A protein has these predicted regions:
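Well-ordered secondary-structure scaffolds
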Residues: 1-220
Length: 220
């Protein structure tokens, strides 16, 4: 079975790994500068590094249908810079999974494939997809909805270690992001962790950096 996954962030990559292990052929699409923050567990870095590995599965950047077909035959996961899915749809997937996690539908329709699945808020089962997967933390996480929609985006991050929105470090201004630390680093309160253009970004508490944008992302 041929499965196209829109998005190659951490949630999309978890889906891709599971389907790949089940023997399905998986292709993923991304934008030119991915917004993934949990980059060590995602296939999106293949867009700018050429290759990304998650749980022993190799994701490779592909720029043509021919490269994509070869990668699939080698049991790799092709990652395409194809935001509109024009190239990917030429592959004629049996299943389309929209796992962009944009909190809204960016153009997926129920006619895109025999089976269309929406992941997270912004989709309505039976209208723009066949089913929706709940992504909100809690008892319904991962539940498949055959009617209605996932819980709307609250704008508040899930609670981890007693912190919700407090665990997010935000830029103080616009500009191209440059990280000054790495995922896995222990940072202290007041430490410089990045720059948004000429605007410094400081940690407002001591923490473990477990998610971080790729350098060159434009902060606005």
């Amino acid at each position: 079975m041929k499965v196209l996954i829109k998005g190659a962030g951490d949630l999309a990559s978890g889906i891709a790994c599971r389907l790949h292990h089940c023997g399905m052929d998986v292709v993923m699409t991304e934008i030119g500068i991915p917004t993934t923050v949990r980059r060590t567990v995602a296939f999106s870095p293949a867009i700018y590094e050429g290759i990304a590995e998650v749980e022993g599965i190799e994701g490779v950047r592909c720029d043509s249908l021919e490269e994509m077909v070869i990668a699939v035959a080698e049991r790799k996961i092709p990652v395409l810079e194809d935001p509109e899915c024009q190239l990917a749809m030429e592959w004629r997937p049996d299943v389309v999974v929209d796992a962009i996690i944009a909190k809204k539908n960016l153009g997926t329709t129920i006619r895109d494939a025999k089976i269309v699945i929406g992941v997270g808020p912004g989709f309505t089962a039976g209208a723009d997809c066949h089913c929706v997967v709940e992504t909100k933390r809690g008892h319904d996480l991962g539940r498949v909805l055959w009617k209605g929609s996932a819980v709307p985006n609250t704008g508040v991050p899930g609670m981890i270690g007693g912190y919700a929105k407090e665990r997010i470090i935000r830029a103080s201004g616009d500009g191209i992001f440059k990280g000054m630390c790495r995922i896995g680093d222990l940072v202290e309160k007041g430490q410089l962790v990045g720059m948004a253009g000429e605007n410094p970004i400081y940690a407002d508490r001591s923490l473990l950096m477990f998610q971080l944008l790729f350098c060159s992302y434009i902060m606005m």
